[in-house]
Structures are given as structure tokens and as C-alpha cells.
Regions:
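ATP-binding N-lobe of GHMP and related small-molecule kinases
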Residues: 2-111, 130, 134-140, 166, ...
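ATP-dependent small-molecule kinase catalytic core of the GHMP/sugar-kinase superfamily
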Residues: 2-15, 21-25, 29-36, 134-244, ...
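Residue-level signal for inorganic ion chemistry
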Residues: 22, 50-52, 76, 117, ...
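Short beta-strands and strand-loop turn motifs
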Residues: 23, 61-63, 105, 214-218, ...
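Short, basic/glycine-rich phosphate-binding loops at helix/coil junctions
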Residues: 56-69, 124, 146, 211-218
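Short, active-site-adjacent cap segments at secondary-structure transitions
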Residues: 58, 253-255, 290-292
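A broadly conserved amphipathic alpha-helix scaffold signal in soluble, globular proteins
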Residues: 81, 123-129, 143-146
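Glycine/serine-rich anion-binding loops at beta->alpha junctions
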Residues: 103-132, 244-258
């Protein structure tokens, strides 16, 4: 039995960080059509912001300018409804009338392989679990999150991880917290197209976590994406003139790592001066082994 939902009226703004896939291998395809993956997730300090304001009725409302995703398809709304439905299922004798306004400030580009939607969903689950005092553990929230998307659990758990399965089997990993230059070309990559493509490498040898440092960290989706989206290949070439560039997830974002913020910003200024990419989204961010979401959660529970 969980606690009775809270009736607090306080608004709070919670972070939803982006992530990078530092490597991505595919070791096979399952009977259900999904792929078995091995990937390394690390968070970066580039975030969406979600402000949660309790309502006096039971409506769940998303507020965001220039965001054309219908509410019924929005993963934020789906996450909020999922938490409430799960609570009512677990506590059938409880009256739950809590609603919420969710003001989204969208900074993470959509369809860029940075996990923005999954992160927004994870933040919604954790924030409303706190706001509504529904009393679920991180493990329980991660389980709920998996039904929303394979990347949601890593954002719920909040630690850099070596992931397997469809991305839900997570082992904590300690990584150097480098500075990253991230470049997002103006294209939305179809994840479905990538994973259905006949040219996709699906037979990588499985790697054990203890052997991870001995293997080349590559993204097997890169050849498929660059072949079908030349602008992603262009992004890799632009950064590649200064530092080794990789693609995150199924793209379209491309990144490179640096030891210092100054080094990353110097290269960023150089590539921004190139006319053909001056309108592309680009930024420098710090790699993080612990999610800003969990730092914020801890600040609320002290």
C-alpha cells in the first residue's frame, strides 16, 4: 500500500537531461523483431525543463509553445497518466483527484538521438511521484518507464550505464566526465528505417563490461544513417577536421569529446563560422555520470 496522494500547491521546475550513446553495437535480432543492443549511456548537462504545478481538478495539461505533438501522443502526458493509473490499480479504494499543469521548456532537439522525449518521461514519473506522494521506488518507476520506451529506465535510474537487451538491462559504469561538442544537423532520422535496413550490422560479438575498455567503441548505425542522410555525414566531416566525431544513437546528432571546456568551445567557434552550418543547433556540454534529475530529487528529499 502506498501513501495517499499529496495535495501540495507548490510549483517546481525539474531538469530532464540529454544523453549520449558513446558506443552502440547490435548483437542480434529477437523473435519479437526488436534488436539486442549493447550501448554506453552518459548524461550531459544540456536539459529540458519541466515545471509541475498542481491543479484543483484531475486534468493533466501540457503547456509548451511551438511543440506540435498531440497531447494523446505526448510521452509526457502518457507518463503522467501511467503513474496515476498504476496508483489507482494498486490502491483501488483510494480517491485520486490530483491533476497537474506541466510547462515544458524544450531545449533538447527532437529526433536527434539525445533522448529528449525519454528523459522528459522519466522526469515526469519522478517529479509526480514526489509531487503526488505516490511512494513508488526507483525500481518501480523504471519498470513503468520501460513500457513508455526502452531508454526511459536509464533516465529514471540516473546513472551512466552499460546497457544490454533493448537497452533496459543496466549496469552502472564510471566514465571520464569529458566535455562534449554536439552538432545537430537539420534532419529527423527515422529509427524504424535504421533498424529495418538490410545493411545494418546485427552480428557484433557480445562484449562483457569488464572487457569494455579493450574494444573499439563504435556505432554500427552510423554507416546506414550517413548513407541515407548525407547531412549527417557532413556533420561528421565538419567536426572530424578537428577531432574524432561519433553519432549518438540513431542520430542525427554528432559529437566529439575534449578534455577541457575551452578546447571544446574553441572548436565550436571554428565550426560555427562555416556558412553552411551556421543555422544548425550546436553546443558544448559536460559529461555526467549522475543525472541532474537525481541531484535535484535529492535536494527535495533532504
Amino acid at each position: 500500500m502506498h501513501n495517499k496522494p499529496s495535495t501540495t500547491t507548490r510549483s517546481l521546475t525539474w531538469p530532464a537531461p540529454a544523453k549520449l550513446n558513446l558506443m552502440l553495437h547490435i548483437t542480434g535480432r529477437r523473435e519479437d523483431g526488436y534488436h539486442d543492443l549493447q550501448t554506453v549511456f552518459q548524461f550531459i548537462d544540456y536539459v529540458d525543463e519541466l515545471e509541475f504545478t498542481p491543479r484543483s481538478d484531475d486534468r493533466i495539461i501540457r503547456i509548451c509553445e511551438d511543440f506540435d505533438v498531440p497531447e494523446d501522443e505526448d510521452i509526457i502526458i502518457r507518463a503522467a497518466r501511467l503513474l496515476r493509473e498504476r496508483y489507482l490499480q494498486d490502491n483501488p479504494s483510494t480517491t485520486f483527484s490530483s491533476g497537474v499543469d506541466i510547462q515544458l521548456t524544450k531545449n533538447i532537439p527532437m529526433g536527434a538521438g539525445l533522448g529528449g522525449g525519454s528523459s522528459d518521461a522519466a522526469t515526469t514519473l519522478i517529479a509526480l511521484n514526489s509531487l503526488w506522494a505516490t511512494g513508488y521506488s526507483i525500481d518501480e518507476l523504471a519498470e513503468m518507464g520501460l513500457s513508455l520506451g526502452a531508454d526511459v529506465p536509464v533516465f529514471v535510474r540516473g546513472f551512466a550505464a552499460f546497457a544490454e537487451g533493448v537497452g533496459e538491462k543496466l549496469q552502472p559504469i564510471s566514465l571520464d566526465e569529458k566535455w562534449y561538442l554536439v552538432l545537430v544537423p537539420p534532419v529527423h532520422v527515422s529509427t524504424k528505417m535504421v533498424f529495418e535496413n538490410l545493411d545494418l550490422t546485427r552480428d557484433c560479438s557480445a562484449i562483457k563490461l569488464c572487457d569494455l575498455s579493450r574494444h573499439e567503441w563504435r556505432n554500427v548505425c552510423t554507416p546506414v544513417v550517413t548513407k541515407n542522410y548525407p547531412v549527417v555525414s557532413q556533420a561528421i566531416d565538419v567536426i572530424g577536421k578537428y577531432s574524432k566525431a561519433k553519432m549518438s544513437g540513431t542520430g542525427a546528432s554528432v559529437f566529439s569529446s575534449f578534455d577541457t571546456k575551452v578546447q571544446a568551445e574553441e572548436v565550436l567557434q571554428k565550426i560555427r563560422s562555416k556558412h553552411e552550418i551556421e543555422t544548425w543547433i550546436s553546443f558544448v556540454a559536460k559529461g555526467l555520470n549522475k543525472s541532474p534529475l537525481h541531484h535535484f530529487l535529492e535536494s527535495q528529499t533532504r
